Structures are given as C-alpha cells and as structure tokens.
Amino acid sequence: MGKSCKVVVCGQAAVGKTAILEQLLYGNHVVGSEMIETQEDIYVGSIETDRGVREQVRFYDTRGLRDGLELPKHCFSCTDGYVLVYSTDSKESFRRVELLKKEIDKCKDKKEVTIVVLGNKCDLQEQRRVDHDAAQHWAKGEKVKLWEVSVADRRTLIEPFIYLASKMTQPQSKSAFPLSRKNKGSGSVDG
C-alpha cells in the first residue's frame, strides 16, 4: 500500500454524496432513509486498483452546496482527486457540477488531479432531467470520466472508484531525478 490519497466528494445538497460513500464502503445505506445534512465528514476506505494493489483513500465528504455557497478553500489544497456528484433528476445539480469543475481547474495550480463525475439516481428514469448523452458529451469535452450510478445498486459504484484509485496511484514512468548518461555513477558534484 502506497501513500494515502485525499479525495474531495462534492456537489449540490441532497444529490446522494454521503449515501454513495456509505453504500460503497459499508454497504449499509437504506434507500429512502431520512437524510441528515452533512457538515463535513471523513471516510477512509481501502480500494483495490486495477493493478491488484490495495490503496488507502481518505474521502472528504463535503457539505452540500446551495445557492451562494462555494466549496471551502481547504478542499483545494493537497487534493489528489475529486468526485463530483449530481442527481440525474436535477438539471440544477448538473450545472453545479459544471461550475465546480471550472473552480477546480482554476485552483489546482497545474497539479494533476483525477476527477470523476457521478450522476446519481439513474434508477429513477421517469424523473430524469439530465440527458445522458449531453452529460457524456460535456464530460468528454472536459476530459473527465462520467458514470451514472444508483445507490440502490452497489455494483454501479465499484467501477468509478476502482478507476479513481488506479488513476491517482499510477506508478511514475520516469524517475523524479533523471540522470544523464554522462553523470551516472560519478557521485561527484564538484568539478
């Protein structure tokens, strides 16, 4: 297991951020149970990557954003990844995700961060307000992966989080300290 990764989970209020985390990590969320508004919580999970390595991930479950509320500035520091959540039955929640993506791009200081977008409540087809193809088109343009998920079906949650953990912990292909052939093995700094 490598370093612990910090992932900020954010989106509009009542889109299912906490329910997604509790169902993913513990499998104990009951659909339709009373919602308690989150202030800010931290969940720690161990996720097996596509390389078969278990990685520890700290999920920062943020308060649901409402009009006028922005993501707190501390959510942008030392963050390895983001999970942006909207509800497929709310166009407003999708617009909030679009704004969050712009805010992240502005604040990430050229650091590579992994962003996944989850459209929750995909099982409520008759209440759908966000077009699946339009959302995928937006995600492709933003170079982020988007999955439609349902807390009612835990299996839909697994693939996005394996992708997230795998992408954040990808081994470096090159050394952080490349040595030219000329200097290899000399060990001497003075000339």
From Swiss-Prot:
Keywords carried by this UniProt record: Cytoplasm, GTP-binding, Nucleotide-binding
UniProt-annotated location(s): Cytoplasm
Residue segments, region Small GTPase-like: 1-191
Region (Disordered): 170-191
Motif (Effector region): 35-43
Cytoplasm among keywords: yes
Sequence intervals crossing the membrane: none
Main location: cytoplasm
GO molecular function terms noted in the UniProt entry: GTP binding; GTPase activating protein binding; GTPase activity
Residues given in the record as GTP binding sites: 11-18, 61-65, 120-123
Matches recorded under Pfam families: Ras
Disulfide bonds: none
Family annotation (Gene3D superfamilies): P-loop containing nucleotide triphosphate hydrolases
Gene Ontology CC annotation, any one: cytoplasm
Role according to the record: Atypical Ras-like protein that acts as a potent regulator of NF-kappa-B activity by preventing the degradation of NF-kappa-B inhibitor beta (NFKBIB) by most signals, explaining why NFKBIB is more resistant to degradation.
Family: Belongs to the small GTPase superfamily. Ras family. KappaB-Ras subfamily.
Name of the protein described by the UniProt record: NF-kappa-B inhibitor-interacting Ras-like protein 2
Provenance organism: Gallus gallus (Chicken)
